[in-house]
């Protein structure tokens, strides 16, 4: 199955990046969809996010807001929701962590990170499997 078959139902197809204003590639539009991003409106115009700008933005967030390590239990207490119901995104790629990825944090005692406005971040499987992206913070 190719990306074009996905683009028909993809709300990000044909949009530009909210930061650089360049048109999203089919791959970037697909990534926005599978990472469950929301279409962003600016002055009535729809935008998505290209991978380069998104990762640059997340890198800037990690540098500007030094995170505080929190356990899964602390994250649940902070937001009053179970870990399964919390929306936790990867601090490197921005993807939503699955239930299994959240449980990996708990099982391996890898802390989540509380950053600006009590946003909880973690690491997805793709960003931690080779060890190239370290624990955050």
From Swiss-Prot:
It is found in: Host cytoplasm; Host nucleus. Its main location: host cell. GO terms for cellular component: host cell cytoplasm; host cell nucleus. The keyword Transcription applies. A zinc finger (unnamed) spans 17-53, 90-127. One of its GO terms (biological process) is symbiont-mediated suppression of host type I interferon-mediated signaling pathway. Pfam families: E6 (PF00518). Keywords: Activator, DNA-binding, Early protein, Host cytoplasm, Host nucleus, Host-virus interaction, Inhibition of host innate immune response by virus, Metal-binding, Modulation of host cell apoptosis by virus, Transcription, Transcription regulation, Viral immunoevasion, Zinc, Zinc-finger. The keyword Ribosomal protein does not apply. GO terms for molecular function: DNA binding; zinc ion binding. Belongs to the papillomaviridae E6 protein family. Plays a major role in the induction and maintenance of cellular transformation. E6 associates with host UBE3A/E6-AP ubiquitin-protein ligase and modulates its activity. Protects host keratinocytes from apoptosis by mediating the degradation of host BAK1. May also inhibit host immune response. Forms homodimers. Interacts with ubiquitin-protein ligase UBE3A/E6-AP; this interaction stimulates UBE3A ubiquitin activity. Interacts with host BAK1. This is Protein E6. It comes from Bos taurus papillomavirus 2 (Bovine papillomavirus 2).
């Amino acid at each position: 199955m190719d990306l074009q078959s996905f683009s028909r139902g993809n709300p990000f197809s044909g949009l530009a990046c909210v930061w650089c204003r360049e048109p999203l590639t089919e791959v970037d539009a697909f990534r926005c969809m599978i990472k469950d991003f929301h279409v962003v409106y600016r002055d009535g115009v729809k935008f998505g996010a290209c991978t380069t700008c998104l990762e640059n933005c997340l890198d800037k967030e990690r540098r500007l807001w030094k995170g505080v390590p929190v356990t899964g239990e602390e994250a649940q207490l902070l937001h009053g929701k179970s870990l399964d119901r919390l929306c936790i995104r990867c601090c490197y790629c921005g993807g939503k962590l699955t239930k299994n990825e959240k449980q990996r944090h708990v099982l391996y005692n890898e802390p989540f990170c509380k950053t600006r406005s009590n946003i909880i971040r973690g690491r997805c499987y793709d960003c931690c499997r080779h060890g190239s992206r370290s624990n955050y913070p």
